[in-house]
């Protein structure tokens, strides 16, 4: 057997560089690169190995570990989980800075490989700089924090362990059902330790993403339920986009059987916004058409959806409809006593359609779906078409969204909007028009503030030919903005629109909706410090990080600035002041947020009555 004598870190990087996959029919590297922030825990071992393979496996430098992980996650999401990236950090704070991002990937079922440095296996210099000492278990390090938010975790305490750990890691990262973050903790001394590895271990490999076929019996049961339905609705989740050919299969199924399609946050863009069977967004952030149809349906066909509370209205939206859940993951397919069909979305929809033959939804239901959907599109057009406001009135997010899309004639097909948290996810879910799969990039599983700008970098790396528009509130911007400098450094140009409502406007409105007084969310409601402070010049801040930037004060000025931003050669930030109170009133659904059972406040007591009414509507 021919062997190669390599350090553990050299073998690791060489193996990753040898992994390939198919993307749009082309063979490409499975790992597009490694994000790295070096410290004493990884610079000598992993850092040396990355330098040796810098051409085959590019290394990217960031300014914050959580942010670079979010960029990696967004890259994988933009590639519909068919390609991915790795992230390496030092031990201690570098490693734990990844934990929030690991949870983001875990919730969203997105692949990313974490390679944090770890403490010495030998324990000779124990405790080392930044080591977290556990008083009860000598084997615990900071990296044990990854275990609850990793789909697979391994600590490599001997170089030979890579021979089993790496194939397991690849298997999890590319498994459609188990897909999620993988963590390989790399002790500092073992990174540098040499071993005679079999040369065959590093042979180029083509990793194929499986498309599990559905069980015939499950298909028969689902088909029987559908044939008995008169008022069905499809709920398209992220699994439709992650399935190769899933969006096309969804369209063909809907057209063949005349079933309206509602989209979750993760599934939005699976069907073009103007398709006749597009009912629009569903759930708490949904529109009136999809929610009306979902509430009145006698059967819900959920395809690739986690059926989270925002999709189901905390399980109050679907009424008494039967639920058929198509999902590659049994954990998701069996939720809420659904009739489960385990399988890839594209394969399952095609097989289910073949069993249904000429069946279609009832004619009265088809007509109702068309009426509701047409009415919703008219509502959206009225909101996003607003160009002039009274001089004393600030714009709100819906009007800003309209301005963004008006500044490119093919925005629905050309732009990719990126967002994650705050007021914007609800407004974008309702109002953004996407004509191609992937044109709507919303991280709304973990809804992690700070994902937006870093995520935009990952999306731009995946799709350099498209305009990536990051829409972010002032709250999320202040959480994590350092990667503006990274985008300038890497040449990954973004158009960033900052909507400044001077605080956490979304949670302020929720606070008021549950009966409480405004408190500690908007700057004006903070009880500590001088009222109204601080006064933040976001445009000046963005310029200091290397971007082009300007502040505008009207929708007309915003459109002009966005034209300049689209024509610019580097990241361009446009800031506009927005109303923290106004939102799109059309649509929406009840969302369970616990309201105090007893309170001295009459408004809280009134909110409790509304809460109890919502509880009575929940499915049991």
Language-model features: locations:
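Glycine-rich beta-strand-to-loop/alpha-helix junction loops that act as flexible
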Residues: 236-239, 303, 420-421, 472-475
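N-terminal alpha/beta PP-like core and its mobile active-site loop of ThDP/TPP-dependent enzymes
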Residues: 2-359, 403, 493-496, 537, ...
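Active-site diphosphate/adenylate-binding microenvironment
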Residues: 34-46, 373-454, 459
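Active-site nucleophile and cofactor-binding loops and adjacent substrate-binding regions
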Residues: 35-40, 59-70, 87-94, 157-158, ...
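Thiamine diphosphate
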Residues: 123-136, 333-334, 341-342, 349-350, ...
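Phosphate/pyrophosphate-binding active-site segments
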Residues: 157-160, 198, 319-320, 324-421, ...
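Conserved structured core elements
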Residues: 6, 10, 28, 216, ...
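A structural motif corresponding to the C-terminal end of an alpha-helix
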Residues: 149, 403-411, 542-547
């Amino acid at each position: 057997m021919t062997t190669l004598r390599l350090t553990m870190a050299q073998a690791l990087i060489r193996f990753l560089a040898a992994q390939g996959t198919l993307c749009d029919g082309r063979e490409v590297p499975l790992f597009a690169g490694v994000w790295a922030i070096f410290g004493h825990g990884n610079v000598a071992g992993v850092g040396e190995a990355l330098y040796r393979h810098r051409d085959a496996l590019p290394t990217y430098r960031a300014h914050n570990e959580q942010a670079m992980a979010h960029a990696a996650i967004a890259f994988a999401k933009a590639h519909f989980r068919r390609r991915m990236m790795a992230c390496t950090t030092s031990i201690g704070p570098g490693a734990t800075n990844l934990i929030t991002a690991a949870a983001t990937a875990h919730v969203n079922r997105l692949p990313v490989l974490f390679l944090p440095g770890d403490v010495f296996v030998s324990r000779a210099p124990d405790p080392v700089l930044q080591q977290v000492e556990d008083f009860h278990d000598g084997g615990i390090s900071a990296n044990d924090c990854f275990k609850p938010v990793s789909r697979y975790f391994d600590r490599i305490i001997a170089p030979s362990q890579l021979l089993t750990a790496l194939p397991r890691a690849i298997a999890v990262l590319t498994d459609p059902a188990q897909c999620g973050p993988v963590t390989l903790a790399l002790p500092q001394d073992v990174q540098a330790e040499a071993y005679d590895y079999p040369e065959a271990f590093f042979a180029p490999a083509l990793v194929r993403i499986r498309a599990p076929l559905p069980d015939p019996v499950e298909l028969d049961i689902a088909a029987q339920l559908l044939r008995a339905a008169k008022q069905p609705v499809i709920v398209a989740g992220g699994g439709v986009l992650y399935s190769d050919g899933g969006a096309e299969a969804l369209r063909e199924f809907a057209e063949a059987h005349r079933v309206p399609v509602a989209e979750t946050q993760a599934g939005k863009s699976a069907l073009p916004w103007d398709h006749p069977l597009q009912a629009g967004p569903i759930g708490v952030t949904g529109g009136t058409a999809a929610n009306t149809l979902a509430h009145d349906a006698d059967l819900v066909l959920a395809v690739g959806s986690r059926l989270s509370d925002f999709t189901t209205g905390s399980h109050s939206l679907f009424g008494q409809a039967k639920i058929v859940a198509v999902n590659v993951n049994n954990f998701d397919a069996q939720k809420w006593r659904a009739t489960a069909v385990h399988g890839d979305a594209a394969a399952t929809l095609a097989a289910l359609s073949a069993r249904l033959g000429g069946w279609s939804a009832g004619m009265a239901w088809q007509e109702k779906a068309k009426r509701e959907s047409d009415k919703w599109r008219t509502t959206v057009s009225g909101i996003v078409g607003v160009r002039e406001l009274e001089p004393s009135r600030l714009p709100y997010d819906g009007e800003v969204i309209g301005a963004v899309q008006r500044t490119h004639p093919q925005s629905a097909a050309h732009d990719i909007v990126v967002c994650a948290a705050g007021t914007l996810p609800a407004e974008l879910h309702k109002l953004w028009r996407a004509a191609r799969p992937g044109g709507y990039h919303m991280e709304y599983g973990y809804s992690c503030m700070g994902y937006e700008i870093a995520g935009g970098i990952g999306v731009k790396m995946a799709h350099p030919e498209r305009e990536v528009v990051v829409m972010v509130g002032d709250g999320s911007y202040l959480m994590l903005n350092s990667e503006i400098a990274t985008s300038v450094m890497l040449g990954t140009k973004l158009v960033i629109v900052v909507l400044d409502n001077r605080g956490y406007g979304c949670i302020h409105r929720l606070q008021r909706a549950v009966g409480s007084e405004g408190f500690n969310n908007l700057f004006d409601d903070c009880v500590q410090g001088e009222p109204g402070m601080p006064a933040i010049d976001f445009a000046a801040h963005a310029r200091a990080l290397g971007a082009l930037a300007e502040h505008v004060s009207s929708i007309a000025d915003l459109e002009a600035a966005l034209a300049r931003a689209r024509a610019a050669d580097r990241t361009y930030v446009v800031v506009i002041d927005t109303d923290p109170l106004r939102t799109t009133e059309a649509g929406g659904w009840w969302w369970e947020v616990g309201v105090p059972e007893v309170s001295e406040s009459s408004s809280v007591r009134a909110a409790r009555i509304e809460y109890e009414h919502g509880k009575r509507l929940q499915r049991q």
